[in-house]
Amino acid sequence: MAKIMIAMSGGVDSSLAAALLHEAGHDVTGVTLHLWEGDDDRLAESLCCSQEMTESARRVCAQLGIPYYVFNYQREFRRSVIEYFLREYASGFTPNPCLECNREIKFRALLARARALGFDYVATGHYARIRVDKTPADHSASPSPNGAQRAVYRLLRAVDEEKDQSYMLYMLGQDDLARLMFPIGEYTKAEVRALAAARGLASANRPESQDICFVPGGDYRNLLREERPDALRPGPILDLEGREVGRHQGLPLYTIGQRRGLGIATGQPMYVMALDVARNAVIVGPESALRRTTLRAERVTFVSGSWPEAPFDCLAQIRAHADAVPARVTPVEPERVEVRFEHPQRAITPGQAIVFYDGAVVLGGGRIARD
């Protein structure tokens, strides 16, 4: 029996994860991370920090007969996630705040707190899997000096490919995976709902939220206007030859691949190609120019903890819901790689993550850099 802290959002995924661990005989404690203090009009009931979702998690824990606590991480969330989100947009990147929340709050901070409180593991309702290989399959882990086999932890895609969240977890390393559990990674979403309903869990039919928790409705522009009005400086919209074809209302309001809302008339459809921070300019061009075969990535980490010594072939995924496609990754220097795709990719976006896979196994990933 293990002592397990499970992070609970109030939704069906983490609720079933808690139930499965409890039924397996583990000593389970549910916790909800209070990250964002939105007012009632701004914070939808379906979002993770709402009072309704907190009460949902509390009801499930009461139903299971396990302890439940709420941890306040508002200060850490603002510093590590909201400020990052605003800073990235102001710098001409398109950020992924949920990925940063996973990195800094849901795993780094929560794992540290769980360890301090004497828990063996942290579990979540993420759709991903962890596999433990006793015999190393690569050179990243060698047998221990006494000849005993060493455990090597692999992060894998979930069984449900549509719900798979491994892209958002690429930053996890060996020490993290050794203390994490993803109980629902072997199930499809339909199976999760059915299993939750069979147990009578209060959250079995709760709808999913697709919004960023601190940007209900998905419109981040109001947050930028409130907190970083200095970043919304009007400037030129330039074509690929440098000709001004219009004016923009601030770089953070645009993203790579955008067509609508540009307010320009050039005789052909034009798309955002790049955000030129130095000139405070939005660069536009035809759809064909959006496709590229190469990119550079920075802040790259590998699940194995070892840096590759040579180029390697893999499947690379450049956004959360994109397909992973064949590519070759060439290490350049610590934490930086160059990636060449077998076929051109559309709208490669600086600030988003690129994640490397070997089949279903996550190798690592990093942030797409600006050219």
Swiss-Prot record:
Site (Interaction with tRNA): 126, 352
Subcellular location, record wording: Cytoplasm
Record field: catalytic activity: S-sulfanyl-L-cysteinyl-[protein] + uridine(34) in tRNA + AH2 + ATP = 2-thiouridine(34) in tRNA + L-cysteinyl-[protein] + A + AMP + diphosphate + H(+)
Record-level GO cellular component terms: cytoplasm
Disulfide bonds: 101-213
Active site: 101 (nucleophile), 213 (cysteine persulfide intermediate)
GO biological process: tRNA wobble position uridine thiolation
Keywords annotated in UniProt: ATP-binding, Cytoplasm, Disulfide bond, Nucleotide-binding, RNA-binding, Transferase, tRNA processing, tRNA-binding
Pfam families for this protein: tRNA_Me_trans, tRNA_Me_trans_C, tRNA_Me_trans_M
GO molecular function: ATP binding; tRNA binding; tRNA-uridine 2-sulfurtransferase activity
InterPro entries the record matches: MnmA-like, MnmA-like_C, MnmA-like_central, MnmA-like_central_sf, Rossmann-like_a/b/a_fold
Binding positions for ATP per the UniProt entry: 7-14, 33, 125
Xref: NCBIfam families: PRK00143.1, trmU
Function field: Catalyzes the 2-thiolation of uridine at the wobble position (U34) of tRNA, leading to the formation of s(2)U34.
Name the UniProt record assigns to this protein: tRNA-specific 2-thiouridylase MnmA
Taxonomic lineage from the root: Bacteria, Bacillati, Chloroflexota, Chloroflexia, Chloroflexales
